Amino acid sequence: MTDDFEPEMDLAEQIFMLLCEQPEGCSEYQLIQQLKARHSTHIPNLPLLDKLVLFRTHFLVFNALYRLRDQLWGENRHTLQISPLCVQLQAYVPGTSAVVENDPLREYYLDMTNLRDTDEGEVERLLASFW
């Protein structure tokens, strides 16, 4: 028996499976390493040393996380804490608002043109402005 993910599984489904296995949560980096170890076909299996590979991998993971959070909240199943330092499934609590209506980060990561239109020069500018 193999622990590899089925290729037809969506990245959000793969992430959900990983998060269910670790209720304490994990960092984004740990999540990426676990996806690679289970041969996810949705993220590049390349070292994260290249800035463009790092950006694209990060973007794909965060896109999947925001889609998963919306799905789980819509199904009244879980809330999802999303941060590079800790991604964690949390209990759904009726009457609370886990999904913010105007969330610029959510909007950014759900817009796939941001992935497609960001080249190496733009990644350099983003990293320079971040640090």
Regions found by a protein language model. Give the residues of each.
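Short "pre-J" leader segments immediately N-terminal to J/J-like domains in DnaJ-family
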Residues: 2-131
